[in-house]
Amino acid sequence: MMKVYFIGTGGGAPSRRGLPAYLVRREGLSILMDCGEGTQITMIRNSLNIMNVNVIAITHLHADHVLGLPSLIQTMGMYDRKERLYILGPEGLKDLLTETFERTYFSPNFPIEFVSSYESQGIRVRPFRTCHVVPSQGYLVEEKDTANLDAERLRREGVTDWRVMRMLKEGKEVPWGDRVLKPEDYLIVKRGIRIAYTGDTRPCETVINSVKGVDLLLHDSTFEQGIDASEYGHSTSTEAATVAREAEVKRLALIHISARYRDTSEMLKQARRIFPMSFVPEDLSFLNLRA
């Protein structure tokens, strides 16, 4: 099971919604996607332990997505963190942090590693290109598929040799009597959970192709229908819903809500006309995803 926490679902100017921050958790692994101003305060006040964050993935260097990161890292240092922190992000992120730390007289006292992708404990985090007004990337969080052997079927067919079963599970074909046992005939594949987060983006083919079939898509929905979001490199609710429909995702979270909207009911209504499995998460809500 994966758990997605919607820490900050707003964007741009502060509002009743926090600035962008989304936490994905699975069995001891915590991945923070974007870190707007105030992220660590919200997490600490709501018992989301910042020290458990293993990976931080930043989409781009606009202030509302990244300015909470230097202070979060400094707090981790003050709490005497020892574990390595992995950071993914666009070009310039490392320089931004280095200069901020120098000018605020802080030197990280735990290992920080900047990586282009991350894989551990059966989870992979990798970027995909988005369509914003500055260099920007979204992220896929993917759980590996698992394969279990249909031992009952094998027994019915008289195959009980554990060595044969092991070879089939390893994906190898096995000669058996006058035929060949093929692994695809006896393996039951359980598809892993897949989550996609766009950060800020226009609707575009690169995003659609990257998020095909995910279980949950968190897509920029800054404005309601009727506003030209292209000038700002953002999307409307109907544009986000169209991406979700074309990419055949399972669920759509409308995020990065502009501060101008206190009531998102019309935004949600617009999206659901196109993609019924849309929702607008509130700050500090969460969603459990099961394969």
UniProtKB/Swiss-Prot annotation:
Residues at the catalytic site: D64
Amino-acid positions noted as binding Zn(2+) 1 in the UniProt annotation, renumbered to this chain: H60, H62, H132, D200
Keyword Transferase: no
Keywords attached to this entry: Endonuclease, Hydrolase, Metal-binding, Nuclease, tRNA processing, Zinc
InterPro entries: Metallo-B-lactamas, RibonucZ/Hydroxyglut_hydro, RNase_Z/BN
Keyword flag Methyltransferase: no
Source organism, top-level taxon: Archaea
EC numbers on record: 3.1.26.11
HAMAP family, per database record: RNase_Z_BN (MF_01818)
Subunit: Homodimer.
The family this protein is said to belong to: Belongs to the RNase Z family.
Protein function: Zinc phosphodiesterase, which displays some tRNA 3'-processing endonuclease activity. Probably involved in tRNA maturation, by removing a 3'-trailer from precursor tRNA.
Name of this protein: Ribonuclease Z
Gene name of the record: rnz
